[in-house]
UniProtKB/Swiss-Prot annotation:
Organism of provenance: Conus pennaceus
Prosegment location in residue numbers: 1-16
Keyword Isomerase: no
Tissues expressing the protein: Expressed by the venom duct.
Subcellular location: Secreted
Domain commentary: The cysteine framework is III (CC-C-C-CC).
Name of the featured protein: Conotoxin PnMLKMF-01
Keyword tags: Disulfide bond, Neurotoxin, Secreted, Toxin
Length: 36
């Protein structure tokens, strides 16, 4: 579900303004590039 009203949209709304570190140190639209 990529529609704004789906779970993904709500998830992005929750993380908006407070991005987290990517769990695998990679880059993603929902998290920062942390680590090496």
């Amino acid at each position: 579900d990529d529609n704004p009203g789906g779970a993904s949209g709500k998830f992005m709304n929750v993380l908006k303004g407070q991005p987290l570190c990517c769990p695998f140190g990679g880059c993603h639209e929902l998290c920062h590039c942390c680590g090496s």
